[in-house]
Amino acid sequence: MAGHSKWANTKHRKERADHKKGKIFSRTIKELISAVKMGGPDPKSNARLRMIIQKAKDQNIPNENIERNLKKASSADQKNYEEVTYELYGFGGVGIIVEAMTDNKNRTASDMRVAVNKRGGALVEPGSVLYNFSRKGACYVPKHSIDEASLLTHVIDCGGEDLDSDDEEFFLVLCEPTDLASVKEALLAKGVTCSEERLIYVPLRLVDCDEETGKSNLALIEWLENIDDVDDVYHNMA
């Protein structure tokens, strides 16, 4: 899939699987807290909360963790989480998009500035990088659950646009953002397991880098990924 590069495929395939899963779990818990803050703690009357609780269970987040965070979310001391997006240029004209979910935007902004100070690159105005990317829906299908050829047939039948097989653990079924819910439902109806569904950024064009530039960009990207509030980092490095 566009957005995965030779640098990502050699370096990021060696990423800590536990770290990646931890980020997914953390994001889901933040979404749960946000849903409670917006619509109340009762899943019977809060459709978004009901959906996120099911999502957490699908990700094998323990029930005690879910219950503990439901209580935490109901506390007046617990701040709500906000989604924030940062745009950067790395080395060699590579564009980087950072998505974070935070209860303290000042802290997250400070962490972003530290990343740039330590690893280079530049934070830029909103829209400066986004035009190089397209917003897509993505359903995450565990690779152990189905072979690529079979899934590709289902993707076409279910209204998906493309299939990304670059990730070590998941196939990504790509579609238009507005079609994400219907594509997921169609996949589930065919017996396909969808561990998660969400919106992602896919680059419209890739930027070639030499080895030194690629390593510098990876160092910046890895620093950004390790910021606690950061959920996803996208880039257009070839």
Curated annotation (Swiss-Prot):
GO terms for biological process: regulation of DNA-templated transcription. One of its GO terms (cellular component) is cytosol. Keywords: Cytoplasm, DNA-binding, Transcription, Transcription regulation. The keyword DNA repair does not apply. Its main location: cytoplasm. InterPro entries: Integrase-like_N, TACO1_YebC-like_2nd/3rd_dom, TACO1_YebC_N, Transcrip_reg_TACO1-like, Transcrip_reg_TACO1-like_dom3, YebC-like. GO terms for molecular function: DNA binding. Residues 1-21 are annotated as: Disordered. Residues 9-21 have a biased composition (Basic residues). It is found in: Cytoplasm. Belongs to the TACO1 family. This is Probable transcriptional regulatory protein CTL0717. It comes from Chlamydia trachomatis serovar L2 (strain ATCC VR-902B / DSM 19102 / 434/Bu).
